[in-house]
Amino acid sequence: MEDINKKEAARKKSLGELGELFAIKALVDRGYDRIRNLNDKSLNEPFADLECEKDGTKIIISVKARNKFEKKGTLNSRYNLGNNAYGKAYASEKKHNAVAHWMAIQFGKTTFSIYFGSLSELLGKKAIPVDLCEKKLIGEIWEHDKRHYFDFDFYSNK
């Protein structure tokens, strides 16, 4: 049982790191600069994973990378922000003099989607409603079911 837990923890950590790489590329593609992975300086920075700027506005981003489908095969439609996300985001905004945002990266076996928005537009929700992102009711769609070209078996929750 312990080996299964270690393997699952490694899978989730790797999926998170993959998500951060996809997030950085998405930010570059959209003209953001001064992109910095905050986890490089101090592991598990509260709330934010990335910091960047565009048009003089500094933002911090919590990246949530998840499997598109849950183990039972249903759509994983809500990505939890974590405990006390708004309190941590507020502290991080003050620390970095930036505005808090989120990025949800949804990985399927052969495709990925990226959704992006400000924390304030979640209106206190404790999770990112990816189903509402897909319907264009919240956030922005940066990529939708775009093909990726890597073996996803390791990252799959099946």
Where are these regions (language model features)?
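Short acidic loop-to-beta-strand element that houses the catalytic metal-binding Asp/Glu
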Residues: 44-53, 58
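Acidic-basic catalytic patches of nuclease active cores, encompassing PD-(D/E)XK
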Residues: 1-39
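Amphipathic coiled-coil/heptad-repeat helices and related helical stalk/stem segments
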Residues: 20, 43-46, 85
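Non-catalytic C-terminal interaction segments of nucleic acid-processing enzymes
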Residues: 105-158
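Acidic active-site catalytic centers that drive phospho-/nucleotidyl reactions
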Residues: 20, 49, 62
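Short, catalytically relevant binding-site loops at active-site mouths
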Residues: 42-44, 67-68
